[in-house]
Swiss-Prot record:
Residues 1422-1463 are cytoplasmic. Glycans are attached at N93, N454, N1057. Interacts with sPLA2-IB/PLA2G1B; this interaction mediates intracellular signaling as well as clearance of extracellular sPLA2-IB/PLA2G1B via endocytotic pathway. Interacts with sPLA2-X/PLA2G10; this interaction mediates sPLA2-X/PLA2G10 clearance and inactivation. It comes from Bos taurus (Bovine). This is Secretory phospholipase A2 receptor. One of its GO terms (cellular component) is receptor complex. Residues 21-1392 are extracellular. Disulfide bonds join C178-C204, C192-C219, C260-C354, C330-C346, C406-C501, C478-C493, C617-C634, C699-C796, C774-C788, C840-C938, C915-C930, C992-C1096, C1068-C1088, C1209-C1223, C1280-C1377, C1354-C1369. Pfam families: CysR_MRC2_N, fn2, Lectin_C.
Amino acid sequence: MPLLSLSLLLLLLQVPAGSAETAAWAVTPERLREWQDKGIFIIQSENLEKCIQASKSTLTLENCKPPNKYMLWKWVSNHRLFNIGGSGCLGLNVSSPEQPLSIYECDSTHVSLKWHCNKKTITGPLQYLVQVKQDNTLVASRKYLHKWVSYMSGGGGICDYLHKDLYTIKGNAHGTPCMFPFQYNQQWHHECTREGREDNLLWCATTSRYERDEKWGFCPDPTSTEVGCDAVWEKDLHSRICYQFNLLSSLSWSEAHSSCQMQGAALLSIADETEENFVRKHLGSEAVEVWMGLNQLDEDAGWQWSDRTPLNYLNWKPEINFEPFVEYHCGTFNAFMPKAWKSRDCESTLPYVCKKYLNPTDHGVVEKDAWKYYATHCEPGWNPHNRNCYKLQKEKKTWNEALQSCQSNNSVLTDITSLAEVEFLVTLLGDENASETWIGLSSHKIPVSFEWSNGSSVTFTNWHTLEPHIFPNRSQLCVSAEQSEGHWKVKNCEETLFYLCKKTGLVLSDTESGCQKGWERHGKFCYKIDTVLRSFDHASSGYYCPPALITITSRFEQAFITSLISSVVKTKDTYFWIALQDQNNTGEYTWKTAGQQLEPVKYTHWNTRQPRYSGGCVVMRGRSHPGRWEVRDCRHFKAMSLCKQPVENREKTKQEEGWPFHPCYLDWESEPGLASCFKVFHSEKVLMKRTWRQAEEFCEEFGAHLASFAHIEEENFVNELLHSKFNRTEERQFWIGFNKRNPLNAGSWEWSDGTPVVSSFLDNSYFGEDARNCAVYKANKTLLPSYCGSKREWICKIPRDVRPKVPPWYQYDAPWLFYQDAEYLFHISASEWSSFEFVCGWLRSDILTIHSAHEQEFIHSKIRALSKYGVNWWIGLREERASDEFRWRDGSPVIYQNWDKGKERSMGLNESQRCGFISSITGLWASEECSISMPSICKRKKVWVIEKKKDIPKQHGTCPKGWLYFDYKCLLLKIPEGPSDWKNWTSAQDFCVEEGGTLVAIENEVEQAFITMNLFGHTTNVWIGLQDDDYEKWLNGRPVSYSNWSPFDTKNIPNHNTTEVQKRIPLCGLLSNNPNFHFTGKWYFEDCREGYGFVCEKMQDASGHSINTSDMYPIPNTLEYGNRTYKIINANMTWYTALKTCLMHGAELASITDQYHQSFLTVILNRVGYAHWIGLFTEDNGLSFDWSDGTKSSFTFWKDDESSFLGDCVFADTSGRWSSTACESYLQGAICQVPTETRLSGRLELCSETSIPWIKFKSNCYSFSTVLESTSFEAAHEFCKKKGSNLLTIKDEAENSFLLEELLAFRSSVQMIWLNAQFDGDNETIKWFDGTPTDQSNWGIRKPEVYHFKPHLCVALRIPEGVWQLSSCQDKKGFICKMEADIHTVKKHPGKGPSHSVIPLTVALTLLVILAISTLSFCMYKHSHIIFGRLAQFRNPYYPSANFSTVHLEENILISDLEKNDQ
């Protein structure tokens, strides 16, 4: 039942007051089609071409334009016609039937509201028909016949939109249908509504007035196929199947079947004993009998499941006798009975169970490959069929003897896995004049479970009428197949029959199929799809489909065709002509074959309410009831065509003889029906754009030419080819071969490959512009003259039968497909997610990320074409930990999402890590355990260039004063001194442009570290050169090959909650300077209009001089950064030696506790060029690590997941990343750190024990015994009060560090704990419950806006990241109790006072930055006095208490002597 929001519809139709009937309102066929899909239509007089409009008193005929809401109608319950605008139903006063018709309350009793449509008439009671009087008013009459159609539907009638009952779920109406319309809250609803429900579920009343009767139920939600297991479903965690137990409903079998179908589900099927036990458990011990999907309603077949599950498991009630088994055709399940299945009268009313698959591709997928023809070679006496060989043994044997006989011939007793194999069996038995044969299906179990003797899964069953009929007390049951339709019967295994053996054959090449290239063979015929849309007259002429359109003679042929057309179906509006036509307008449809001969119809496959009318021609649907036949207008309707011709004894037409057989070579592209192949050479794939002549020469090196268009189909293909690669909004222009360069051609345009010019491709206005002699092609089917010397991208063309040459400079990359600045490689073979992560990484790419709807559409179209049937493909989404948020593996932000609603999460207790996938059928995303095997896609942002690149050595140059040297760049950090210096993103970019640069493009981890280390001591974030509308490309045009996106709050948009508002906000890249190491240096998107600092970049000026890296100034042994002093030790040493050496220098092996110092050391190590020992080690094989100087910190910087398990001692490599190795290993250096203060032990003696243990820190005691308790905020608060304590508060940074260190052990078990904070509405601030302000806070990227704070929200600490988060006070979380210590034993150690240190804020490390001037004189590079004080709101929760001081920068110790001189 289509559901439409009444409020939305009325809003669309509303016009300004006073002009409701007169205001112009544009209606397109698309809009009408949307309404019609929802059952809403406009009634038009076929003869008068006017439309029915309702008013308060009468109905009149008015001009259809402009339409309004009072013209909209809908069939509703009890055959009533409901007017949308008037909120009433069409009624007839039977006591005075000649008076004008009017609109009445839909539950009126004094008028008749029932109407029927009969072809094009509207008929009421006593055969009264809706007629029109001369004054255009509507009346009821028996005298005249007036015809009505649906406006703008191509002549369709209003009978096409009949109402279909919606059976309710749950509620109190026992499953009875919704009553439409029903009145609720003084409003008539013609559809289900969410009004009045907090859970937002759709519901309806089952009587006309809800307030009077209060009968209601939930609606079968058509969107539930996308939602998964919602509130009215229960999920089997193991099978990912949802079940709906409607135990309070009472419906017939067909009504129950309809109810399930409306939810994208089916009546219960039971595939095996495990599933039966699951259902039995949920039904309990009550003797309730429920409908399931088992039925024998197909008169020509036996018992089957309504969802096409193979029927090989059976558990019939043993006392079943033959008579009711024959009489009753629907199956029930009774959990109270061990033998739970029973047949019943299908009209009985019972409860029912629905079933749907969370992943529909797991079920019901027809093997398309089963219908593909494979030429096969077999031994003499064996019959070939699609890769297998069969032999009917005409010596009668029992089933077991037949099995042994086949095995002795290296074959098996045949299995049958598809309808295609059934057709072969029928043909073979017919040729052998045999009526029946044993097949390899048998059961040896109780309950009965049929299995194939070769061990293959039972994926298809084809039972005979009344089968499978189970013999009681029979331990072994065997199955035979009969000849007429290939149906199966259960037999006594001791009977003797012929038997069919099967074994693998030798598959021959496709050329031996007997069909031309592009045609598919089935039986003795070849078939082809002409994908060009044509009228029936053109399609059936014999020219495009020689010799004729297809005739279909059996269900097997129909199934083959249904499979064939699925490969080209793109939209629900895809149709295919077949040869069926009512040529004489008699209403009788016959086949129109070659020679205009009429052929009788032996088989039909009509769709619902078909054939609709006489005189039409027949199409086959491509989607939504695929393969079903429908009547369409022969002249005006356009469709593809299905062609058919015999394999042998055919005469080739002239067109067929010239048909190009060759596929395109390498990575050239074409489509069926085109004689040439094309290749687009665009700027991302070549080293440079070219002039027209250069482009033509480029094509000629392949043996090709610039593209020409021999006919419109070639232009259409090229146009679609461009659309498949580039954004439609891009104004790209490509050289093609169209030119008028030849002076002897009198200025006429010609194609460079000699193709005749068959159309005027250029507008007349362009003729005469003599200087523009070459044409470019735009992706909107436009050709423009251009100057031949301008440089463009280009398109080449080559005949199919010509193999392209391979120029020596060409780098072949065929498997990769380009789309919008990235390339994709589709791996069809299935494997685990981690395998593809490795493969993609090895190919210098990443597992697929999807960042826009266009990219989603591109991926979906490709995997749909590559998947033979419904297949899921891995994408790059993965949980870092079970139940964590999904993140792109390459670190890019998750901005665009296309989750199948409810399927991004595991619904059960399974803690396995999950990864994301995309469905080839729906294109929607869902998640699955990462160990499952699926195909996948690699994506590389660095596009492979097909031309071999000539290496041009880079040269270092100079930077202006005030800029920092990094590699070949100059960087300028602009840190505002106050709010007046803040700049928005656009202003920052303008400033950079004025300085000859752009906002920075961070190209690698070392550059990221260099910028981060220079932000130390400042409090502002900085803009970088990214925008959200193209965040895969830097502002300077380079692709984003390195990224450092924040895993939290990637989009940081305050005060805007709706997606619609967010779309209007420009978002730009910001680099965070939050001291919490989870956020330091991370990127996220911020409103471009906000003010921050920024970083500019430009290339060094190498025009004056350059310098060799050997001229770099050496790094000194002692370095100061922040309030720390580092010593670099250069010598071959083990970790133990490094530890002793540091002690000899009055230092310790370095401990790294935040991202700033990590970034500083990253820059140093990259400059030095080899790995160094640091002070981290483990004594428990990598389970936990400690710093050798006793520092406690949760900060880590591991290289990868495995790098912490390779040894007991840790080093930092040249990228700064940590790895463990054997402590006895020799490295070339170590990093020492000089202690700067007396360290304080945070853990003193335990507090005196009560009923729970306490840990003391400073003057407080803490109980961590309740961290794993899961309770609400109020319950946690009360628990602590009873223990004489309070719920946890965090008053300073040291306390925060202590707590997070203690909580580290719990991070895998609990995610969040409660904090004892509350929202002060008067001051709009967060306060601790004791009234003190929250000076120490850690909200991550930014503090939530005031509007987020609501009475029912509480504050929790998220343990893995150390950030605070708002959460419902009713959520279940762990907690910590805190109280003051009885005795304060903490002795305060005198700390050092403020000191001034020299640190290199602008350390230019890997900075092959060097200035070479002839004087080679030296100059000191000085910087002004800078304060490194951290403000309270930017405290680092993990950083040990430290004394930050004011420092001076003396000189950059990493720049070269020459560089110093140049400054």
